[in-house]
Curated annotation (Swiss-Prot):
Belongs to the NrdR family. HAMAP family: NrdR. Negatively regulates transcription of bacterial ribonucleotide reductase nrd genes and operons by binding to NrdR-boxes. One of its GO terms (molecular function) is double-stranded DNA binding. GO terms for biological process: negative regulation of DNA-templated transcription. A zinc finger (unnamed) spans 3-34. This is Transcriptional repressor NrdR. Binds 1 zinc ion. Residues 49-139 form the ATP-cone domain. It holds the Pfam family ATP-cone. InterPro entries: ATP-cone_dom (IPR005144), NrdR-like_N (IPR055173), RNR_NrdR-like (IPR003796).
Length: 151
């Protein structure tokens, strides 16, 4: 790895430790030429996951899209950022556990709705209305009736 200060190609590791979440290793390095120190992070390289959209186009999985969609659905509701992050984590965990390289939006939506329903039913209906493309008030009423029947 090249030194960011002098571009010399050799360094020694001064300190190495796992990050808080255990997903990467933080290393303090010292350049063998200029003796300046810098930090690097080592992370496992993962295979990119493709999302198959409803129109059959494909795009790279983007966790931020899930978080942003949930933020909109949970706006002005008693749902914390931490809970939203946990739902996004659950989606990633599910995809990872099944070792999928491609996943359709339907599967992602189902995982989100299953988890969101446990946290806040109003946010769940909001999310479902966009995800399932509710066309009219009757569709909203049917979904609310289903929720009430299950409670």
């Amino acid at each position: 790895m090249k030194c960011p200060y002098c571009a010399y190609g050799e360094s020694k590791v001064v300190d190495s430790r796992s990050t808080e979440d255990g997903s990467s290793i933080r290393r303090r390095r010292e350049c063998l030429k200029c003796n300046r120190r810098y930090t690097t992070y080592e992370k496992i390289e993962t295979t990119p996951i493709l999302v198959i959209k409803k129109n059959m186009s494909r795009e790279y999985f983007d966790r931020n899209k899930i978080v942003n969609g949930l933020m909109k659905a949970c706006q002005k509701r008693p749902v914390s950022r931490k809970q939203i992050e946990q739902i996004a984590n659950e989606v990633e965990r599910h995809i990872s556990n099944e070792m999928l390289t491609e996943v359709n939006t339907d599967k992602i939506g189902q995982i989100i709705m299953k988890n969101l329903k446990k946290i806040d039913e109003v946010s769940y209906v909001r999310f479902a209305s966009v995800y399932r493309q509710f066309k009219d008030i009757n569709t909203f009423m049917e979904e609310i009736k289903n929720l009430m029947d299950k409670n």
